[in-house]
Amino acid sequence: MGQYYKPCQIENKKAIEWIYSHDVQSKWTRDDGKVFMMGEGLKLMEHSYVRNKLMQCVEKLLIPGGDWYKKPIVWAGDYAAPEEGSEDNLFSMSDEERTEGERISFKIQSPKALTLAQSSKYKFVVNHTTKQYVDKSKSPERDGYQIHPLSLLTAEGNGQGGGDFRGRDSKGLIGSWARNIISMEKEIPTGYKELIFNLKE
């Protein structure tokens, strides 16, 4: 079965805020030329691309002044392991069906995205925990698409469901930045080292 994901901002091993990808509506064109609106996909490789609107929504939260700027981030999969001492993983913690007294986290209503022009300026995904950065513009291109490093680097649960990344990951990049302090920047912070992100399917 397919594994669904939610980008989450976490604190003390709990999801504080999250985005539901179906809430991010994009215009699509059918083969007959008719335009329609549809939410972005829930599976990891349905939305993990540069210029994808869900990715641009998370980028907007991670730029200077954004609500998630320099905060710990996880792309939480629903098949990921539960948190220590809990039956819930971060995906199930971010559940709006919980009653108010049980609620741990809150869904961001009507998430806003960077424009394509703005997104292209914030090309550095920065990890302030490891003092590393990735230049998303260098992500390998295939059939006109580039995988966005942010979601794969912070993913938990990959490889356990349909729609997960199935390409080669010889350096163990996937999930290596999960729960780290992340931001999107226009410039490389002084003293930070580049991490080469070369994953492709």
Regions found by a protein language model. Give the residues of each.
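Short, extreme N-terminal segment that most often corresponds to the first beta-strand
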Residues: 1-25
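A short, exposed loop/beta-hairpin motif centered on an aromatic-Gly-Thr core
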Residues: 16-31, 36-42
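Low-complexity intrinsically disordered segments
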Residues: 33-201
